[in-house]
Every structure is written in C-alpha cells, then in structure tokens.
Curated annotation (Swiss-Prot):
Motif Q motif: chain residues: 26-54
Enzyme Commission number(s) from the entry: 3.6.4.13
Protein name: Probable ATP-dependent RNA helicase DDX47
Positions bound to ATP: 70-77
GO cellular component, one term: nucleus
Pfam families, per database record: DEAD, Helicase_C
Chain positions found as Phosphoserine: 9, 426
Assigned keywords, A-Z: Acetylation, Apoptosis, ATP-binding, Helicase, Hydrolase, mRNA processing, mRNA splicing, Nucleotide-binding, Nucleus, Phosphoprotein, RNA-binding, rRNA processing
Domain Helicase C-terminal: residue ranges: 239-399
Length: 457
C-alpha cells in the first residue's frame, strides 16, 4: 500500500531536476495511456510526454484529483485530456467531462485538442462561450456531447435556461488557467457550477500560479489532491532570451518598426494594453507594409478566431494582442514577444512571454520601458529574480525611420477616426472591419511600402 500517496494533506510531486534521463525514455504508453490514444499522440507529433504530463497522467489514471502547476507552454492540455479520454474509453458516457476556461479562444483550442486526440474514437465536443448564438449552443448541448468546454458565465446561462440540460452525471471537472478564471471575477459562477455537479467526480485544477484564491478553490473543489509542480512560483523558461529597451514614450512606434526590421523573418506577438492601441498599432504597421493583424476583446468572435487562425497558419507574421490572448493559446511558431505596453500586473509578464520559447524551443522577449514605466519594470525584475539586459539598437538608424513612421501614424489615426464614425452609423463591432486589411489605399500613400534594412547590415 502506497501510504505516501494516500494521506489527507496536499501532496507535492515536484519534478526532479536531475530526471532528464528518465524523461527521455518515457513514452505515453509507459504512463499508462491506452494504445489508440498513443497512436493519436504520434499523429499529432507528440513524440514524448512533457514534464507535467509525466507527473500528472499516471496519478490521474489512478483516479486521483490533481493540482497541476506548470509554466505556460508545458503541455497542460494533454495532461488532462489524455486521462479523461482514457476513462471515457473504459466507460463511455455522454456529458462525461466539463472543462472550464477563462477565455473563448482557449476554449476553442482545447476543443480542437480533444477532437484531434479522440478523432479515432468519435469524441464529440461542445464549446459554450459568449459572443456566439445561444440557440446553436443549446442545440449542441441537446445532442449530449462527451466533452463540454465552457467559460463559466455562458455555462451558467445554459444551466439555468436551457431546457433538459444538466450535468448531474458528470464524471470529470477540469479548471484550466484557474488563476485567470478567478482573477476575472468568475468566483460566483464557479461556486454555482460546483453546486450542480456531482460530488463524486474527479477534478483537475491547472494553474500557472498558486494564488490564495486558487488555494481556496482547491479546498472547496478537490478531494485529497496531489500536487504536480514542474516550475517554481514565478518562472520563465530557460531558453527564453529576455531584454528591455528604455526609450522615450514618443519614440515607441519608431523603435517597434526598427525591431521588426532587425528581426525580419521571425514571427512576432506584440502586446498592447488597450483594444484601441492594438488596433492603432496594427493599422500603423499595415501602412508600412508589415503583415500585422490584431486580436482584442472588441472584435467579434468570428474576427478574433479569424485573426488567430491567419497567424497560426503563418499567413500573417505579426499578431498584435491585448492580454485576452496572452494565456493558454497554443501558437507554436512565435519567435519574438514584444511588450509594447508594459503589463500593469507583473504576473501578466510571465504569461505574455510564455508565448515564445515553448516546449523546448528558444525565443526572445523584448519589453519597452518608458519614463513612466520604471516602477512597473522593477517589479517584473523582482518577480522573475533577474536583471534583464538591454536589447542592442543603433539609435541613429532608429531616428532615420522617424519621418515615415510619423506619416504612417497620421494615416492610422485617420483610419481609426473614420472607423469610429462608421461604427456609430452602422453599430458594427469594431472588429468587423477588422483588421486593417482594407487599408491598401492608405498604405500606398506611405512611400515605399515596407521598409528595407540598410545594406551592409
């Protein structure tokens, strides 16, 4: 009898730092995953399990409740999807599992992974999120899918108003990005959901950080859980090269264009603090010939998914986003993250830069620091426990870009104004004219299109 795994207190299964040799020999079959799902992993290119999967999957297959703490990009979705599908194969049932997520985009992404892993066994998923017609979701729920992936608010709406829909037979509950769910003030909704699902269930809670709110939720929702932690409290991955640039705020646009030219050929994710600045900067870059596309909360759901898919398909090399896009999204080819606007909350820095250097790859993160951001930047350095180096620039070359950037700024402001007026007239969502791709005429006025790097560099 393994007494060490059976006592009542929260246990810790820290991943040993010296276990590299063991990890290299582990396969999904070694973890106890059934053959048909191992084949699905092979087809998805999952050659070997990640650290969090090695820690969590065997315990989940034993029927334990799990708290998974792992850095962004660590394979968390596979860590809960594989045990759930394994159990579904053994005891097939409709409305078998519920996955709660903080954002719509993450919900669709999790659904894609469940459907890909379960394609050979006919797994059916329903995504229940805001911004999409409730009636079509009600019809999807009436078909009783195996897996429901939902944001808490819209799920409560269906539990209260959709006739015949309930989760009384649910076997698995997953809360993914639990810290973000709670930070978005979904606590009331989560409490309501916990009251209408069976107590006799398995619960997996995954979070990048173990906040006080997450600890409180863990006590309310999990029974004798085991903790699988593969990262320190606040950690950025080892292969991430982190830099900062201290610049006057009026030159931020110019330095951004310089960096995009210097690192041309890479894919970029650029974080802005507001929807308006995301849209403005996307227009600015488009006017200069860059393949930039925005993703923010004022865009319609279809436009947000469209932007995301264009970027994932490499049809666009630059994605400008607010923090709505900074957590959980599996975009495998981001080479460089730029914090164009420094995050107000230091923890958001961890999640933003977690878009690059994922699953063993290397990447860069560059944070713009203006005269107004020094205190916020110092908090970030304190949180991650290191002083960041300056990203090298040639200031004279940056200043040579000023005239053209200024002209592009002017046209971007004009387009934003025109769009605002059109929105008032037609009451369209700001994202429905998204996306800056209609700015061809304006772009042609900005001499020369995309800037060329100077010869000899």
């Amino acid at each position: 009898m393994a007494a060490s795994v059976e006592h009542d207190s929260l246990e810790s299964m820290e991943a040993p730092q010296t276990a590299v040799e063991v990890e290299e020999t582990k396969t999904f079959k070694d973890l106890g995953v059934t053959d048909v799902l191992c084949e699905a992993c092979d087809q998805l290119g999952w050659t070997k399990p990640t650290k969090i999967q090695i820690e969590a999957i065997p315990l989940a297959l034993q029927g334990r409740d799990i708290i998974g703490l792992a850095e962004t990009g660590s394979g968390k979705t596979g860590a809960f999807a594989l045990p759930i599908l394994n159990a579904l194969l053994e005891t097939p049932q409709r409305l078998f599992a519920l996955v709660l997520t903080p954002t719509r985009e993450l919900a669709f992404q999790i659904s894609e992974q469940f459907e890909a892993l379960g394609s050979s066994i006919g797994v059916q998923c329903a995504v229940i999120v805001g911004g999409i017609d409730s009636m079509s979701q009600s019809l999807a729920l009436a078909k009783k899918p195996h897996i429901v992936i939902a944001t808490p608010g819209r799920l409560i709406d269906h539990l209260e108003n959709t006739k015949g829909f309930n989760l009384r037979a649910l076997k698995y509950l997953v809360m993914d990005e639990a810290d973000r769910i709670l930070n978005m003030d979904f606590e009331t909704e989560v409490d309501k959901i916990l009251k209408v699902i069976p107590r006799d269930r398995k619960t997996f809670l995954f979070s990048a950080t173990m906040t006080k709110k997450v600890q409180k939720l863990q006590r309310a929702a999990l029974k004798n859980p085991v903790k699988c932690a593969v990262s320190s409290k606040y950690q950025t991955v080892e292969k991430l090269q982190q830099y900062y640039l201290f610049i006057p705020s009026k030159f931020k646009d110019t330095y951004l264009v310089y960096i995009l030219n210097e690192l041309a050929g890479n894919s970029f994710m650029i974080f802005c603090s507001t929807c308006n600045n995301t849209q403005r900067t996307a227009l600015l870059l488009r006017n200069l010939g860059f393949t930039a596309i925005p993703l923010h909360g004022q865009m319609s759901q279809s436009k947000r998914l469209g932007s995301l898919n264009k970027f994932k398909a490499k049809a666009r090399s630059i994605l400008l986003a607010t923090d709505v896009a900074s957590r959980g999204l599996d975009i495998p080819h981001v080479d460089v993250v730029v914090n164009f606007d420094i995050p107000t909350h230091s923890k958001d820095y961890i999640h933003r830069v977690g878009r690059t250097a994922r699953a063993g790859r290397s990447g860069k993160a560059i944070t713009f620091v203006t005269q107004y951001d020094v205190e916020l930047f110092q908090r970030i350095e304190h949180l991650i426990g290191k002083k960041l180096p300056v990203f090298p620039t040639q200031d004279d070359e940056v200043m040579m870009l000023t005239e053209r950037v200024t002209e592009a700024q002017r046209f971007a402001r004009m387009e934003l104004r025109e769009h605002g007026e059109k929105k008032k007239r037609s009451r369209e969502d700001v994202g429905d004219n998204d996306d800056t791709e209609g700015a061809i005429g304006v772009r042609n006025k900005v001499a020369g299109g995309k800037m060329k790097k100077r010869k000899g560099r």
